[in-house]
UniProtKB/Swiss-Prot annotation:
Residues 1-4 are cytoplasmic. GO terms for molecular function: dipeptidyl-peptidase activity; integrin binding; protease binding; protein homodimerization activity; serine-type endopeptidase activity. This is Prolyl endopeptidase FAP. Disulfide bonds join 321-332, 438-441, 448-466, 643-755. The chain crosses the membrane at residues 5-25. InterPro entries: AB_hydrolase_fold, Pept_S9_AS, Peptidase_S9_cat, Peptidase_S9B_N, Serine_Prot_S9B/DPPIV. It comes from Bos taurus (Bovine). Substrate binds at residues 203-204. The keyword Transport does not apply. The active site is at 624 (charge relay system), 702 (charge relay system), 734 (charge relay system). The keyword Amino-acid biosynthesis does not apply. The record marks 23-24 as: Cleavage. GO terms for biological process: angiogenesis; cell adhesion; endothelial cell migration; melanocyte apoptotic process; melanocyte proliferation; negative regulation of cell proliferation involved in contact inhibition; negative regulation of extracellular matrix disassembly; positive regulation of execution phase of apoptosis. Belongs to the peptidase S9B family.
Length: 760
């Protein structure tokens, strides 16, 4: 349930008064023309057509100084930063000949796969057809062509070996024209998954479409096997156009249910026919009860690191294993196990962080909580207890991008104390005396406060991608001097288009409530006048480890509501949200549905005190976890909200996936946390919806938060004789895409305008 990362149409939070400290107006004035006579407000059509969407530029690095990029006319172009050389490596004609939408160059640069017939499955997974193009001869390889559709395909890190997954089994090709070698034979739809995750691991643990990993030089291939044979199945109808609907069946472990059985195997990719796959042992302290595999990291061709979690996800074990040539097995001694345990919540953030190994192939860097409860980078050589803390402070390290022999590159929200910012830092390591440098803090400071980065081999060069708060911009930099080499994308066309638009104003501030800090973003109408009264819409996600109040650029549905309809929008990061320390993050542990809701209500009361909110016109809306929070807020009995919208909400945690739910709630058993599972349902509050206008929305083919959730809410409301509105989208999943998107936002707009008594 990571909808907060994907909602395209959200972003907003609140504004203007004492009690609140530290304000920054996010949207730069350069994209706002104050001459109202020549500008217009945003329209809903602008949003639905993506008129003001921005571009980013991520180089597809193929060496320390070379990268590929797909041009606007669909040519794949090669660039050498140091020589200035540039040429088309794959023409749009070649791409079009097989209707390719994606490509992948082999490391030896002799071949490229072209991907077509994309067919989406779940959040990350899809199937596709793959054609192999011989770049030397300028033709497609016809001998021993790949089967179709393929579930996953990848090149080895060196040369041009291919590994792919077809019908849940793994195959290997030494060369693209060679016949395939079948590695696994037990793959079976919805039963045994080899090299690809099942639904719950894809969505809630790995966050990828693959579960196979090449060793650094392609000597070995590691893969996961997921056995879903005993997992309960969720079944729902897909109506299509046929006389009878078909039934979709997905092995889906809900809270407390039987989980998949996972095993990790490694096979010699050079001589796979001589020695079969070898299983990697699970640490004894993990294997003694239900457990999860959380990630795999190759260190060298003969050393691998695996991470495991207990089912109650407060204990993680990192196990380093070495290949024994004499026995042709993988040895994982207990002395090479490192335990990470949380006594106040779950292990890690949303996921347990992965290690980044240093050049000695023994020690590594990893992000986990320090003694003060903030997530920071630590250096581990022998034991976690003896870890050396690399970063510290009342802020958090977010991601380690790259470790070289003399530098460590990472992102954090340290600069100026704003949790919703991201800057890129370099720390010197190795023989140099440690020193820290912020690479991005003072680059285009007004425009850019939220960065990510993409590094070439050995961090020789890197691209910075700024997401806001001003217009996004992508730039190329020298990895040794940090000097900007060139602008890759500056969104100049978007800048010119926005000169004629009355954009809303955005502010980020914070509320102090008792000993809690609530950061919020408020989106204000262009001609905002604090002496007037405005309707207020709260946009909420609120799930554990999420963050809504970020310094990023977006022209979205809520931008339109502020610009055209004169609605004030607010987003609030309350307890349970991320990157502000464990005290705030773990406050919701085993108590979902309590503090997230309380903090939204508290913020609304503070906004009313500011004097410009019409307290008779306040609404709340959210999607997924946000739909759950908005539903509970509406049913809180406070009388604050006139109306609200819940899109694809969870209604009971017993209905949601085991890995996600149990991470934050424990098990739904009498001797664990069943009582709160029962007390935290939306249905238990059905009577309290009587005095609000409630719009309930769901897709009937939602594989993530099943339609069952909204069906149970509707049943409870009917049984309580509570009037409400509902909209379902046939055959639509959790994202409600395509034509459903336009219908959804049009429908929600009408609902809000009616609630707020706004004219059409």
């Amino acid at each position: 349930m990571k909808t907060w990362l994907k909602i395209v149409f959200g972003v907003a939070t609140s504004a203007v008064l004492a009690l609140l400290v530290m304000c920054i107006v996010l949207r730069p004035s350069r994209v706002h023309n104050s001459e109202e006579s020549t500008t217009r407000a945003l329209t809903l059509k602008d949003i639905l057509n993506g008129t003001f969407s921005y571009k980013t530029f991520f180089p597809n690095w193929i060496s320390g100084q070379e990268y590929l990029h797909q041009s606007t006319d669909n040519n794949v172009v090669f660039y050498n930063i140091e020589t200035g050389e540039s040429y088309t490596i794959l023409s749009n004609t070649t791409m079009k000949s097989v209707n390719a939408s994606n490509y992948g160059l082999s490391p030896d640069r002799q071949f490229a796969y072209l991907e077509s017939d994309y067919s989406k499955l779940w959040r990350y997974s899809y199937t596709a057809t793959y054609h192999i193009y011989d770049l030397t001869n300028g033709e497609f390889i016809r001998r021993n062509e790949l089967p179709r559709p393929i579930q996953y395909l990848c090149w080895s890190p060196v040369g041009s070996k291919l590994a792919y997954v077809y019908q849940n089994n793994i195959y290997l090709k030494q060369r693209p024209e060679d016949p395939p070698f079948q590695i696994t034979y037990n793959g079976k739809e919805n039963k045994i998954f080899n090299g690809i995750p099942d639904w719950v691991y894809e969505e809630e643990m790995l966050a990828t479409k693959y579960a196979l990993w090449w060793s650094p030089n392609g000597k070995f291939l590691a893969y996961a096997e997921f056995n879903d044979t005993e997992i309960p199945v969720i079944a729902y109808s897909y109506y299509g156009d046929e006389q009878y609907p078909r039934t979709i069946n997905i092995p889906y472990p809900k809270a407390g249910a039987k989980n998949p059985v996972v095993r990790i195997f490694i096979i010699d990719a050079t001589y796979p026919e001589h020695i079969g796959p070898r299983e990697v042992p699970v640490p004894a302290m993990i294997a003694s009860s239900d457990y999860y595999f959380s990630w795999l990291t190759w260190v060298t061709d003969d050393r691998i690191c695996l991470q495991w979690l207990k089912r109650i996800q407060n204990v993680s074990v990192l196990s380093t294993c070495d290949f024994r040539e004499d026995w042709q097995t993988w040895n994982c001694p207990k002395t090479q196990e490192h335990i990470e345990e949380s006594r106040t919540g779950w292990a890690g953030g949303f996921f347990v962080s992965t290690p980044v190994f240093s050049h000695d192939t023994i020690s590594y860097y990893k992000i986990f909580s320090d003694k003060d409860g903030y997530k920071h980078i630590h250096y581990i050589r022998d034991t976690v207890e003896n870890a050396i803390q690399i970063t510290s402070g009342k802020w958090e390290a977010i991601n380690i991008f790259r470790v070289t022999q003399d530098s460590l590159f990472y992102s954090s929200n340290e600069f100026e104390g704003y949790p919703g910012r991201r800057n890129i830092y370099r720390i010197s390591i190795g023989s140099h005396s440690p020193s820290k440098k912020c690479i991005t803090c003072h680059l285009r400071k007004k425009r850019c406060q939220y960065y990510t980065a993409s590094f070439s081999d050995y961090a020789k060069y890197y691209a910075l991608v700024c997401y806001g708060p001003g217009l996004p911009i992508s730039t190329l930099h020298d990895g040794r001097t940090d000097q900007e080499i060139k602008i890759l994308e500056d969104n100049k066309e978007l800048e010119n288009a926005l000169k004629n638009i009355q954009l809303p104003k955005e502010e980020i501030k914070k509320l102090k409530v008792d000993d809690i800090t609530l950061w919020y973003k408020m989106i204000l109408p262009p001609q905002f006048d604090k002496s007037k009264k405005y309707p207020l819409l709260i946009q909420v996600y609120g799930g554990p480890c999420s963050q809504s109040v970020r310094s990023i650029f977006a022209v979205s549905w809520i931008s339109y509501l502020a610009s055209k309809e004169g609605i004030v929008i607010a987003l609030v990061d309350g307890r349970g949200t991320a990157f502000q320390g464990d005290k705030l993050l773990y406050a919701v542990y085993r108590k979902l549905g309590v503090y997230e809701v309380e903090d939204q209500i508290t913020a609304v009361r503070k906004f009313i005190e500011m004097g410009f909110i019409d307290e008779k016109r306040i609404a709340i809306w959210g999607w997924s976890y946000g739909g759950y929070v908005s539903s509970l807020a509406l049913a809180s009995g406070t009388g604050l909200f006139k109306c609200g919208i819940a899109v694809a909400p969870v209604s009971s945690w017993e209905y949601y996936a085991s890995i996600y739910t149990e991470r934050f709630m424990g098990l739904p058993t009498k001797d664990d946390n069943l009582k709160h599972y029962k007390n935290s349902t939306v249905m238990a509050r059905a009577e309290y919806f009587r005095n609000v206008d409630y719009l309930l929305i769901h897709g009937t083919a939602d594989d993530n938060v099943h339609f069952q959730n909204s069906a149970q809410i509707a049943k409870a409301l009917v049984n309580a004789q509570v009037d409400f509105q509902a909209m379902w989208y046939s055959d639509q999943n959790h994202g409600l895409s395509g034509l459903s998107t336009k219908h959804l936002y049009t429908h929600m707009t009408h609902f809000l305008k009616q609630c707020f008594s706004l004219s059409d």
